[in-house]
């Protein structure tokens, strides 16, 4: 069901269990993992990540436990259509876990500034929902970045990705970059 959710399609990518083995189908045809894109393989890995967490548990009970979720660059290698599906899927999954237990923590890392802004909006909405559900406890989230081998607060207001890249290129051209 997760693959349908991400691709907005019944047959786009599917995994079926047949004759004691798993079969990968793309648009109804058997394919090997090497025959699908890197982005599609990453989507399968992310779906497996969440499915594995809930293994041998009832759906309702699986989110009530405390978790630390760590997701590294969930939308790398995706075209725009898959990016929309994966961000929607992430919002849904993170919502289940964060609303399931006030102590659950979710760390999502990315190198892409546009993805960061999308995740920022998702987290703002999820935090608001969590604060409504857990009225006595207030959830918060941190926006952090690693720069020059240090982790610091991410100054995201008035920051433009292309401007930042041009500054880095300029400093490199002057020999000032590390």
Listing of model-derived features with the role each one plays in the protein:
Residues 39, 63-65, 101-103:
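Short loop/turn elements that form and flank the Walker-type P-loop nucleotide-binding site
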Residues 12-14, 42, 67-68, 104-107, ...:
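Beta-sheet entry/capping signal
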Residues 59-64, 68-73:
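Catalytic Walker B motif of ABC-type/P-loop ATPase nucleotide-binding domains
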Residues 1-16:
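Amphipathic alpha-helical domain-onset/packing element
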